[in-house]
A protein has these predicted regions:
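Amphipathic alpha-helical segments with low aromatic content
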Residues: 1-25, 175-176, 181-227, 380-419
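A short glycine-rich beta-alpha junction/loop motif
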Residues: 6-13, 121-129, 138, 150-153, ...
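Non-catalytic DNA-recognition/assembly elements of restriction-modification systems
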Residues: 12-40, 221-244, 371
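Sequence-specific dsDNA recognition surfaces
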Residues: 30-46, 60-96, 234-247, 261-293
């Protein structure tokens, strides 16, 4: 790679392959692409199991699809047969589709490019803009990354309209440009970024398989060893509440506290995700201790009530008011780190589900939950199971770090290899 960052040369990226030296063209997007009508079909009008014509919904652009969409393998829903539009424009190889709206200016005009669509009937759907390069200035695979580049999205952030939801329209592309090098250079850029995307996809699959392994092994080991001890949470220790008496002015600085999302999202509390709250001298608030089991108290769905996490840190931290903590006093029956896996096991989730009460919002009946009988492996087996599962968790963290590296590498190239 050649670094042009400090060279006073117009219309070349900061980073490029060394065999290319000529300047890039800056092309107005509205001159590069022709635009075609899209439909406004909602999710209720789509079906993943049956149909003839597939539909690209903007929600899939925002979450679920890669920059390069392989029409032969990436999953897209069909339009229900009874509501297929009378007129539509099918995607061709290399067509792009932009999401025209988002709550985040960074995601407005997020784009995908369609590959391998021969024999596939796919149309662009709700809140999308369908574009095609009929000028033959670009190669297949280049446009999707050019429209994902920082230089393009910097322009979009400037012109996106809205307050809570930001949007763009076809006429906004009169104001935006992308850099277009020779087709040979385009092809080489696309090949590199496609290779990185494929490696990211592989890395995600590795992580998913390890997560599936740990879930299955957790349930299997509990089934094999989980009937050794009959007890209850109230026999194992005592519970305590989260923060109380706080107003919005108290948050933002001060002492660290564990958020609801931290408890909900992690089997073990993530110590890099603390937020902060002012705790006055002499103020009485419960402090979370190492080994405490934390639970969510309420949610809009019963499945999300009583989701647990274990704190294994040593810092003085507090707990948000929408969760409660449980301190294990009886260390002869329970090994606190094991509970980071126990509370996420299928048997435990089935056990806690009936204690979620409510209609529109569900709350955990804490008193009944603590008194209810639970079964645990022996103390030695709890330690043994924890060691096995924690070794896989360590492997998952290693793979996640590698995924972050590849993702960061891709974002760096999207910033440096385009104008």
């Amino acid at each position: 790679m050649t670094n042009n960052k400090d060279k006073k040369v117009l219309n070349v990226p900061n980073l490029r392959f060394p065999e290319f030296t000529e300047e890039w063209k800056k092309v107005r997007v509205s001159n590069l692409l022709d635009f075609y009508p899209t439909n406004s079909l909602s999710w209720e009008q789509l079906d993943y199991s049956n149909g003839q014509i597939k539909n690209l919904h903007y929600g899939l652009i925002h979450k679920g699809l890669p920059t390069m969409v392989d029409a032969s393998s990436d999953l897209l829903p069909y339009i229900k047969e009874e509501i297929v539009p009378k007129s539509y424009t099918l995607f061709k190889e290399g067509d792009v589709s932009f999401a025209d709206a988002s709550e985040d200016t960074n995601d407005v005009a997020k784009a995908i490019e369609i590959l391998n669509c021969n024999g596939q009937q796919i149309v662009s759907g709700l809140h999308t803009i369908h574009g095609r390069d009929n000028t033959d200035q670009t190669v297949i695979g280049y446009k999707g990354y050019a429209f994902a580049s920082e230089s393009f999205h910097k322009q979009i952030r400037r012109i996106a309209q809205g307050t809570k939801v930001f949007s763009v329209s076809v006429r906004n592309f009169d104001e935006t440009y992308i850099g277009v090098p020779s087709k040979d250079e385009q092809a080489k850029i696309a090949k590199l970024l496609i290779a990185i995307d494929k490696r990211i996809a592989t890395q995600n699959k590795i992580i998913e398989k390890l997560q599936s392994l740990i879930k299955g092994l957790n349930d299997s080991l509990y089934k094999q060893y989980g009937n050794a001890i009959t007890t209850s949470f109230s026999d194992l220790g005592h519970s305590y509440s989260g923060l109380s008496g706080k107003s919005s002015e108290d948050f933002g600085s001060g002492k660290p506290f564990i958020t609801y999302l931290n408890v909900y999202s992690n089997n073990v509390v993530n110590e890099n995700e603390y937020q902060y709250v002012r705790i006055n001298d002499g103020e009485k608030q419960n402090i979370v201790q190492c080994g405490d089991v934390l639970f969510t108290l309420s949610s809009e769905t019963p499945e999300e009530v009583g989701v647990g996490s274990v704190y294994l840190g040593i810092d003085e931290v507090f707990l948000n008011s929408f969760c409660f903590g449980f301190h294990i006093d009886n260390k002869e029956l329970a090994y606190p780190p094991y509970f980071s896996y126990y509370v996420s096991s299928t048997p435990f989730r089935k056990f806690i589900y009936p204690f979620a009460q409510g209609s529109t919002r569900f709350n955990l009946c804490k008193a009944d939950f603590e008194k209810a009988s639970i079964k645990l492996p022996s103390l030695n087996n709890q330690k043994h199971i924890y060691a096995i599962l924690n070794s896989i968790t360590g492997k998952i963290e290693t793979e996640k770090n590698l995924l972050e590296y590849y993702t960061t590498q891709k974002q760096y190239l999207l910033r440096q290899m385009f104008i």
